[in-house]
Amino acid sequence: THSAAKPSSAEPTRRLAVSQTPPLVHGVVPLSREMPPQNLMPVPDKPGTWTPPYEEPAWIAIWQNRKFDIVVLVIGLAVLSFVLIFQDWLARHPTALTRLRNGFHVYTLFFIGWWGLAQLSVINVLTFVGSVMQGFRWENFLIDPMLFILWGFVAVTLLLWGRGVYCGWLCPFGALQELILLAARRLKLPEMEFSDAVHERLVALKYIILILLFGLSLQSIVDAASYAEVEPFKTVISMRFQREWHYVAYAVALIGIAAINRKFYCKYLCPLGAALSIPGRFRLFEWWLRRRKECGKPCQVCAHQCSVRAIRPTGEINAN
C-alpha cells in the first residue's frame, strides 16, 4: 500500500477528508488507491475554526463596470436639481427654460431610457412593497445602479416637490411623448382635449389599474408583471419596439394619441404615476408654486398654461 504524503513542514498539520467516493474496482474500494489532491479537502483540526472565503457581492462589480453611466446620471440629476432650486430665476427666462427642458427630455429619452434602460415601472413599486412585507434585502435593489440612484432621487424629490419632478423630467416614455408633441405642434396638428367632467372621470382609471395590479401582486408578482404590460415602457424603452406586433401596435397608438392629446397615457392610464401621487401628496414645500389672492379668481394663467391640467381653475394643484 502507498502511504499518504506527509504534510510540508512549512504548513500547519491538518487532516484530509475524501470529498469524492473513489471508483470501485470489481465492486470493491481498493485500499491501496492513493487519492489525487483534487479529491481531498481540508478539514479543520478544531470544529468551527474553518470559515469560507469571502465573496464580494455581485452588485459591487456591476457598479464598478458602469462607472460611466453612473457619472453621467449623477451629472444629469445635478442639472435638474439646479433647475428645481433656481426655478424662479429660470422662469424669468422662458425661452432658455424651454430649450433647457427640451434638451433634458432628449437626455432622458436617449441616455436614461434607451442607453441606461432605467425606465421606472409600477413593478418596481410592487416588488419593493412585497419585499418590505416578506423580508427586505438591499442586494435585490442594488443590482442595477441606475435604477437604484434614480429611485433614490425620486424618493427625495417626491417629499420635497411631488411627483412632477419624475413625471415631467425623468420618465423616458414621458419625455418621448413631450418630443412627439413638440414635433406635432411644428407640423400644426390639431389639439384634442376632453371636457373637465370627462377629464376628471378618466383620471380615476390609473388608480383602478394600480389597485388591480397591487391585488394581483399579493398573490403572484409574476402575474402582476404580465398584466403590467398596460405600461408600454418595456416595448418602447427596454426592447425598442422589438416585440410581437400587438405590443408594438398598442405602444404606437399611445404615442400617436400623445401627438394630439398631451401625455394622454400619463394622465389617464399610468399606474406608476398613480403610485407616485400617493406619497407626493405629503410634499414638504408648497413654495415652488406660490399662491396669490388672485389665483383662480380672476387669474387663470396657471390653469391655462399647464397643458397636463395639473392646475385646477381655483389655482390649486391637482395631485391626480
Label the model's feature ranges:
Residues A319-N320:
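Long, low-complexity, intrinsically disordered cytosolic termini of multi-pass membrane proteins
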Residues T1-H2, K6-E316:
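Non-ligating segments of multi-cofactor redox enzymes
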